[in-house]
């Protein structure tokens, strides 16, 4: 977080980035899954219902084996992660909740959280997934 930017501005920027990211992520997951790994860092880790997948090749194989999906995000929360916790790397925590229907399966509730890091390119900043944790949610009896 740059010293010249007040915290509220920093939070607002993080929220705008998170909203844009969520739209891109779930549209890509549902419609262009082969491109999904482009949103991840090379050494990113996905935890899918307790199962870890790391690295671009393994992520690509994992996403290819999933049935087609229809995600509906109902809740989005985000917050910047303090730079002291991330060695001055601009990082945002994004949490989503909603429903998903995988082809051949019933609709289920899900919760997913992402740690996004800002990656500078020659003319802009691109947000990449460093960590992704997906869980199906079941109601407690």
Curated annotation (Swiss-Prot):
The keyword Transport applies. InterPro entries: NTF2, NTF2-like_dom_sf, NTF2_dom, Nuclear_transport_factor_2_euk. It comes from the Eukaryota. This is NTF2-related export protein 2. PROSITE patterns: NTF2_DOMAIN. It holds the Pfam family NTF2. GO terms for cellular component: cytoplasm; nuclear pore central transport channel; nucleus; perinuclear region of cytoplasm. GO terms for biological process: poly(A)+ mRNA export from nucleus; protein transport.
